[in-house]
C-alpha cells in the first residue's frame, strides 16, 4: 500500500496543474488528506490507503506511516503528462504541504517523528522545494511542528462555515477581510 495510483483523480490533478501553469498561477500542493472523499455525502471507495486507517491512526500506525513515505515520494517524482515535468521540478509548484488538517493525538515526540519521516521521504525523493505543515489543529503538540525542518506553516480557514447545506449567494469578500488566529493568546 502507499503506491501512487494512476487514475482519473491523478489525471484531473495533472490537467489542473497544467491549466494553472498556463495562467501563470503558482501553487503549494497538499500531498494528502486523511478522511473520506464524500464529505458531507457518503464516501465513494477509491482503493486508497487512507480508507484503511482512521484519520488520527494514519499518523501513528507504523504501516500507515510507511505507506505515506512511499506515496509522498512517488507523488513528488510523478511526471505530469501534460507538462512533461515532475512535480518536484515544476517551477509553478512552489512547495508541498505534507497533509491537510492532520490529527496527532499522541505525544510531541511521536508527532515530531512522523513529520521528520515525511520530510526524510521527500528529501530522499530529491525534493528541494519548501515543505509546509498544517498547524491549525493539535495545539497540545504544536511545539513539535517547530522542532522539525519544515520551512513554513499552513492553516485552514472556513470564514463562512464549512458546509451550509444550500447554495450561498452574495458578496463574501467581507468575510475574508481579516483573519483572527483562534489560538493566538
What are these language model-derived features?
Residues 100-108, 152, 157-185:
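Active-site clefts of carbohydrate-active enzymes
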Residues 1-150, 182:
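Active-site mouth of glycoside hydrolases
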Amino acid at each position: 500500500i502507499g503506491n501512487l495510483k494512476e487514475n482519473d483523480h491523478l489525471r484531473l490533478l495533472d490537467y489542473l496543474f497544467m491549466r494553472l501553469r498556463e495562467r501563470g498561477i503558482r501553487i503549494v500542493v497538499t500531498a494528502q488528506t486523511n478522511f473520506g472523499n464524500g464529505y458531507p455525502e457518503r464516501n465513494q471507495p477509491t482503493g486508497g490507503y487512507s480508507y484503511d486507517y482512521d484519520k488520527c491512526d494514519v499518523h501513528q500506525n507504523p504501516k500507515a506511516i510507511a505507506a505515506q513515505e512511499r506515496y509522498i515520494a512517488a507523488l513528488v517524482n510523478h511526471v505530469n503528462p501534460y507538462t512533461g515535468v515532475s512535480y518536484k521540478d515544476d517551477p509553478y509548484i512552489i512547495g508541498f504541504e505534507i497533509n491537510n488538517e492532520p490529527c496527532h493525538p499522541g505525544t510531541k515526540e511521536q508527532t515530531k517523528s512522523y513529520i521528520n519521516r515525511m520530510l526524510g521521504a521527500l528529501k530522499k525523493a530529491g525534493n528541494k522545494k519548501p515543505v509546509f505543515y498544517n498547524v491549525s489543529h493539535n495545539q497540545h503538540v504544536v511545539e513539535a511542528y517547530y522542532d522539525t525542518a519544515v520551512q513554513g506553516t499552513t492553516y485552514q480557514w472556513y470564514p463562512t462555515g464549512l458546509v451550509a447545506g444550500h447554495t450561498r449567494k452574495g458578496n463574501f469578500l467581507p468575510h475574508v477581510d481579516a483573519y483572527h488566529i483562534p489560538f493566538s493568546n
